[in-house]
Amino acid sequence: MANASKTQIIDYEGHIIDDLKEWMSDNGLSKLGFNYNVIAILGSQSSGKSTLLNNLFKTSFEVMNTKLGHSQTTQGLWLSYDKFEDELAGGSSEGTDAESKNKSGDKPVVNPTLILDVEGNDSKERGENRLTFEHRSALFSLALADCVIVNLWYHSLGNFTASNYGLLKTVMEVHLELFHQNVNCPKTILMFTVRDWFEEFAPLDVIREKIIEEYVNKIWQELKKPKSSKNAKVDDYFIIEVVGLSHGIIKKDEFLKDIKRLRHRWVYELRPVNYSRNIPADGFAQYCHNIWNTIVKQSQLDIPSQQEMLATFRCQEIKNNVLNSISGMIKEKIIDSKNRYIENFKTWAETDIIEKSVNEYLIDASRYQRSICLKTLEELLEAIFIQLQTIVDNNLNYTQRILSSKFSKELNSMYSVCTTDKGYFLLSSDKNADATEQDDNLSNMDKSGESAKKGNQSKCINLWSNFLYNADMLEYTTISNFYDQYKKCTIEIVEGSMASNESKDSQEKKNHDFNYKNSLTILATSIYKDTNRIRSVQCNILIERIRATIKEELKNVDNMLVTVKCSKDYWDYILKVTNKLEDYIYTNLSKCFVNLKIGINTTHLNNGDNIYARLNTNSDYGFVYSHNDHMYDFSDDENNNFDEIDTEIDQSKNDMESLFNSKKFEIITKQNKKEKYVSSINNDLTKEMNNKKLILELKNFYIEIIIDALKIKLDEISNDIANVIINRFESVFNYDEIEQPRQWRNVSVVELKNIFRVSKDYAFLIVEILQKNIKIDKLDKHLPNNFINTDIIEKGKSKAKKRIQEICRDAQYIQETGGQMSLKNVPFAFWVILLILGWNEILMFTRLFFRLNIILPMFMAFIIIVGSCLYTGNAQVLSYLNKIAFIVIKHSYNFYKHLQTVGNQPTKPEKVD
């Protein structure tokens, strides 16, 4: 039940009304802050309390109609207000309160007062249950009011009930109960309004002394005080005021004058400057609600606790309102951040979000307990930071994608010279050449192709030998750039922002650091994957180039297949080449392999926190880093949960030292980056190169590469064993000791047989040589004896035997014929005579060629056959062709006559009409 000027806050049944907050807001009271006061009135029923308030504060509380008889009028507790607009309009300057005027002194400033009209005690309507409600209402009034008016009649001062002695005792007991623990509690104004007082009866000073001595002090002495207030005086808790009011009917004019004087005293003398209970106006409704509920539940009413509870409630409410007001802006920015990088995030967040939110929050929340206000402010900022974290994550993810791509491109570009060069190593005769020597002196070298190739070779070896160092330094640069971008997202906030008397420059500032670990972990994962990928590619390039070098060095093995005469010479040569290659690889490329090869077991590197230990992982290019006794795997397994890992890392004190080299990250995160990061990887590699276990592992690896290439070469030879045998046979059969072609016309049959036998034995000796039937310690482990498949050998032998026999038959034929059937023995004059005698035939064949298409294929086939025989020197076929030519020439004349007869037949004459 409320209207524009008043509202009921506690009904007759003792239930609090929920619309108090709305009523205060509608009447412009919720924005007063602490600039208001509360006054409550207690007294017997029908003692004129509401009448007094209506006259004193211009309120409109219901009053008793005496014509209808005495009855209960005010039920429960009602609340109204007075803004003292008449005082403001009148511009009274009689007040002495310094706060009653504004800073310019032109117009008085009077805080509004909330007036609490309490149901009268000693009520017949409530009967025996009245004491409960009276105690509750008194307790409620004292918890709220700056001033409590005790309304009593002059003629009842000597009575117990009518003089409100029992009520006064209840008031003082309750006040002591409420505030005895609060040393700095505000004093409550206890104002006794003596109604129907006449100066003729007794001076006001006498009445004041009587009330103080016989009522206040006596009751105070009778009270059972707690130990903390045993020696306390009544003046420590109350300000006693006694006011005499004339009879409202008999001396109405005097009564109104007394009311006016009391009103003026309240406005300019009695009222506290601000609400003494330190409850802001916007929290007054909730404070009333909390106080009454605590009283009804018969709980111990602790005013500081209630104030703390109200402060918590209101600060939370204000915080939520602020969050609601800015959530729309943040959501729009979050959506925008999904599509692009948010520029000037720091300025936008500090000015449009943080500063605006803090100011909006402190306007109302700063009126409540400072500790709770600041605590809730931290919660507000934390809630804002949680929302802003999404934008920061999107910005950092955008940054990490760019940096990840840049890292990959730069590392790839750094090694592009090695990727494009597909050649082989030029083996240096200097065994002590420094594999990591810089190519600064290459400009002084010969500019020939070989020198340029050596320059590229030296550059690639230098790059490969420093791969981990280059990747480590590039990682440092990348992470440093990421951290620089992250610092652009940090927000500067002002500590102690509630201290309004401090300038912003004098207030301490601190940065809020957003969580960047998720984005940094993704970037680190990408760096490790790209590094391992490029590392693997470069390792494969290095191995392929070594294989090409081995293949180049094994070229002489093909030449030896024709000339070698014993197995020992052949395999000693292969062993020599193997040792040469192994020595070159070990001397010049060992550091390259330690940098590039994944899976090499090391001591100094794997046990450190450098990049090598993180890169030396599985083929999925995940990365592993250790922290204390825990191991975290960041491979691409779907079961891995980065959030869970992040949580575990957060629980660790030095979590970032696990992700990166601790010194590196310490340098990166320093505000003043004067210290330069120096990678220790090359020093660790130098120590590692003296590790005997590593040296043995590397040498075994080199031997495996060389043997693999050698096996491929030997497999090629095995598959071509027939041609190898034939070439060896021809090198002895067709040429004599001084490498001159043999003249078979001058060789006897016996000599031919001996030559054939020797050549055949020499040719088939290669099979025994290739089977490695001798012991070679270094190669036996990898290349056993008789390693060539028997089937391959037999097939090769069979094919070679056929060809050898053909070669021998040709030699025998030449030996028998003496070479007479060869076209080389036909006189040149024969060809001239053949051309002259066969000229007409050539012309006839030419004419037939243009008439009969079948002649062309036959002619072309003939030309091809003859040309092939001439080219290959097939004497047998050429002899057949010679015989055919002689037969054609012998019978050419008869053939020519026949053609002339056919050609000279007269044509049939045409008929003439």
Swiss-Prot record:
It holds the Pfam family RHD3_GTPase. The chain crosses the membrane at residues 826-846, 850-870. Disulfide bonds: none annotated. Residues 1-825, 871-913 are cytoplasmic. Residues 33-288 form the GB1/RHD3-type G domain. Keywords: Coiled coil, Endoplasmic reticulum, GTP-binding, Hydrolase, Membrane, Nucleotide-binding, Transmembrane, Transmembrane helix. It comes from the Eukaryota. Its main location: endoplasmic reticulum. Residues 847-849 are lumenal. GTP binds at G43, S44, Q45, S46, S47, G48, K49, S50. Gene3D superfamilies: P-loop containing nucleotide triphosphate hydrolases. One of its GO terms (molecular function) is GTPase activity. Its EC number is 3.6.5.-. Belongs to the TRAFAC class dynamin-like GTPase superfamily. GB1/RHD3 GTPase family. RHD3 subfamily. This is Protein SEY1 homolog. The lineage of its organism: Eukaryota, Sar, Alveolata, Apicomplexa, Aconoidasida.
